[in-house]
A protein has these predicted regions:
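Beta-rich carbohydrate-recognition modules and glycan-binding surfaces
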Residues: 1-169
Length: 169
């Protein structure tokens, strides 16, 4: 029987081997805060506080250091426990605009305090560059980065736990 999911990132493994970094709106003068840490539940916790001051309003983390060809798959499945807010699954490929990476994002809504597996089809991934929408197609054959962004224009604390990120058919 053919596998219907393929684990890309398993946060229950202590040896993740991925480069992870947080990028907040401070890159453009904002005051939002975000951080990532491993939990005792064997998950990654992405938490912080969104501030709308100084034209801010986002926090994100990015995972790089690996490349994925997911052309035989339909989308990404994430196993998360959230706070009821809407986040974005974000991917980068070789696609460029003005010499920097284009981001492809699809929004997903979390269920407060419940673990859920959410499936995001590649067809839902929309291109943008520094918040500006672009007319570009997402190519799942050349993914070089994955991550999560919170940019729901709501000030306040946030928390999202992630157990795994997989491809699904």
């Amino acid at each position: 029987k053919e596998k219907t999911t393929n684990m890309l990132i398993d946060f229950t493994e202590k040896k993740a081997g991925h480069q992870m970094n947080v990028v907040n709106d401070g890159v453009m003068g904002g005051l939002s805060q975000g951080a990532i840490e491993m939990t005792q539940n064997d998950s990654l916790l992405f938490k912080g506080n969104i501030s709308l001051k100084n034209n801010g309003g986002f926090s994100s983390f990015r995972i790089s250091g690996q490349r994925w060809d997911l052309s035989d798959w339909k989308g990404i499945e994430i196993h998360v426990r959230g706070d009821g807010r809407s986040y974005g699954l974000r991917a980068t490929t070789e696609e460029r605009f003005l010499r920097s990476s284009v981001s492809f994002t699809a929004d997903f809504k979390t269920v407060k305090d419940d673990w859920v597996k959410l499936r995001i089809p590649f067809s839902a991934m929309k291109a943008s560059w520094r918040g500006r929408k672009l007319d570009r197609n997402f190519d799942p054959a050349q993914i070089k980065g994955l991550g999560i962004i919170l940019a729901d224009k709501q000030a306040g604390k946030f928390a999202l736990e992630i157990k795994s990120i997989s491809a699904w058919k």
